[in-house]
Design a protein with these regions (language model features):
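Extracytoplasmic thiol/disulfide redox context detector
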Residues: 18-171, 244-258, 285, 290-309
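Cysteine-centric redox/oxidoreductase cores and disulfide-bonded domains
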Residues: 21-28, 32-34, 65, 165-262, ...
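Bacterial N-terminal signal peptides
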Residues: 7-17
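Residue-level signal for mature regions of secreted extracellular proteins and peptides
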Residues: 11-13, 127, 231
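Short linear sequence elements within intrinsically disordered, low-complexity coil regions
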Residues: 12-13, 44, 66, 271
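A broad, structure-centric signal for solvent-exposed, well-ordered loop/edge residues
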Residues: 8, 56-59, 89, 124, ...
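N-terminal secretory signal peptides that target proteins for export/translocation
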Residues: 1-4
Length: 309
């Protein structure tokens, strides 16, 4: 029994040495200040220092998790290395060379049921996180369609995901819901709606009141549905319900992969932030085609010139 008790006590002491420990208040305060300063965080962002656990990969260091919460569900944990003397903290990025980063990122984007343009069999997929009220999105949309769609043809598939910036664009979520109501019956109706809104955003903005702007969106939606012979009663019911579930799920997915502005494109996983030139888009598309073993379009000298504004 004595041997058993001793063995149990030894095992207990070993385990106690490995369990997580709360960061002492003074250490937690230092860590929080360093994180706030380095990432230039405003006071309303909540920084929480988690437990300290021994590192199994880095001798001489412990691991500490820091949670950064910007509100509205935008919360993420970051792992740091903390020296045993608590005087040094490191932020390392670990790369898994057995996985392709672009393929891994694309696998995190759910494209199920989304309307597409181009060929579904294309080896290059362009995912655009779009906001119908965003003026830069409108300019990007008019670069992608029809110019790049015509130029790349069946070499590329284009897919749109919802990422309305509701804090600054009050009718963007409503427009996204309306567009998805159209898509539920006919993907072509979705694209005609997207083409129209991005080309005629002022028509909605020109209405005098917020309610009138939403009514204008619904009117455009019903007209597009009529054009494509959609079931008017079903479309009207969908528009009236304004179910934001799918839109907000798309927004959360964007948050998870680093989207924080619009437009944001992923070309076979390569991220492009904001409005960029058509030359940069062509270069990225061509690179993705070459990586996929596909031919790039043959261009004339005139097609290489900057697009007119």
């Amino acid at each position: 029994m004595t041997i058993i008790r001793r063995s149990f006590l030894i095992l207990l002491l070993i385990c106690l040495g490995c369990v997580a420990q709360s960061a002492p208040p003074d250490v937690a305060r230092k860590i929080e200040r360093q994180v706030r300063s380095y990432y230039n965080m405003p006071p309303d962002v909540k920084v929480t220092v988690g437990s300290i656990v021994p590192s199994t990969e880095w001798p001489g260091y412990d691991m500490v998790a820091v949670n950064i919460d910007g509100g509205e569900g935008k919360s993420k944990d970051y792992q740091f290395l903390l020296s045993k003397d608590r005087n040094t903290m490191l932020r390392l990025t670990k790369f898994d060379l057995t996985k392709d980063p672009y393929t891994e990122l694309m696998s995190k984007i759910d494209l199920t049921g989304r309307p597409t343009r181009g060929a579904k069999s294309a080896k290059v997929v362009v995912v655009n996180f779009d906001d119908f009220e965003c003026p830069y999105c409108s300019r990007m949309h008019q670069t992608l369609f029809p110019e790049l769609l015509k130029e790349y043809g069946d070499r590329v598939e284009f897919v749109y995901k919802d990422y309305p910036l509701a804090e600054i664009h009050p009718w963007a979520i409503h427009a996204a819901v309306d567009a998805n109501c159209l898509a539920a019956q006919n993907p072509d109706a979705y694209w005609d709606f997207a083409d129209y809104i991005h080309a005629n955003k002022r028509e909605v903005d020109g209405e005098a009141t917020p309610g009138a702007r939403l009514q204008a969106l619904d009117k455009i939606t019903m007209l597009q549905g009529q054009k494509h012979n959609e079931d008017a009663a079903k479309l009207q019911a969908c528009v009236k319900a304004q179910d934001e579930t799918a839109v907000r799920a798309s927004m959360r997915q964007g948050d998870d992969i680093g989207v924080n502005a619009t437009p944001t494109l992923f070309i076979n996983g390569q991220k492009i932030d904001g409005l960029v030139s058509i030359q940069e888009l062509r270069a990225t598309l061509d690179s993705a085609l070459k990586d996929a073993g596909q031919p790039v379009p043959t261009r004339t000298a005139s097609s290489s010139l900057p697009a007119s504004k």
